Amino acid sequence: MIIGLTGGIGSGKSAAADFFIDLGISVLDADQVAKEALSTNSPGYTDFISQFGEVYLNNNREVDRLKLRELIFSNPSKKKDLENIIHPIVRSAISNFIITSTSPYSIVMVPLIFETNSYKNYDKIITVDCDLELQIVRASSRDAQNKSQIKNIINKQASREERLSISDDVLINNSTLSDLKKQVNVLHTKYMELLNE
């Protein structure tokens, strides 16, 4: 069974994923794969320079992610160009992960699962959800961005309603990490029972 794990920025996806890992479940972070797709030793890096030019590199010749983020949020066609570089790399990594995973079920953490229509590729979808204000506070403190930047990112992502509409299971992360862990344990038990039917 392959499960997609999603949620908006600052919802607690990574915390939930870590709890599944603690239970022995294989988890792939598609966002991390996407970030690594533009690292200096990757094929995506070369494609990136060809497409975007060296103006989006910092002094260390690494992709200047802040500058790039500003570009793609203001220019939809550039966002599409970037996706055309990154998405094939991510899809390949997900395929390899699924083939090689040995845990009873596997989880792929995909923040933009609704936006990319990739939710159709999974047996189940888990959404980590939390109140909007909590989401903004968490994301702005973690990512060193101001609240208006975080709100802008949230407005560009799928709405809570859209994410929840494709979800089989929802983890409500409005409380403590301990509470989130309990919810993950309940889901894990449910999935193990499903697999043993």
Swiss-Prot record:
Pathway: Cofactor biosynthesis; coenzyme A biosynthesis; CoA from (R)-pantothenate: step 5/5. InterPro entries: Depp_CoAkinase, P-loop_NTPase. It catalyses: 3'-dephospho-CoA + ATP = ADP + CoA + H(+). Residues 2-197 form the DPCK domain. One of its GO terms (molecular function) is dephospho-CoA kinase activity. GO terms for cellular component: cytoplasm. PROSITE patterns: DPCK. It is found in: Cytoplasm. GO terms for biological process: coenzyme A biosynthetic process. ATP binds at G10, S11, G12, K13, S14, A15. Its EC number is 2.7.1.24. Keywords: ATP-binding, Coenzyme A biosynthesis, Cytoplasm, Kinase, Nucleotide-binding, Transferase. PANTHER family: BIFUNCTIONAL COENZYME A SYNTHASE-RELATED (PTHR10695:SF46), DEPHOSPHO-COA KINASE-RELATED (PTHR10695). Belongs to the CoaE family. Catalyzes the phosphorylation of the 3'-hydroxyl group of dephosphocoenzyme A to form coenzyme A. This is Dephospho-CoA kinase. The gene is coaE.
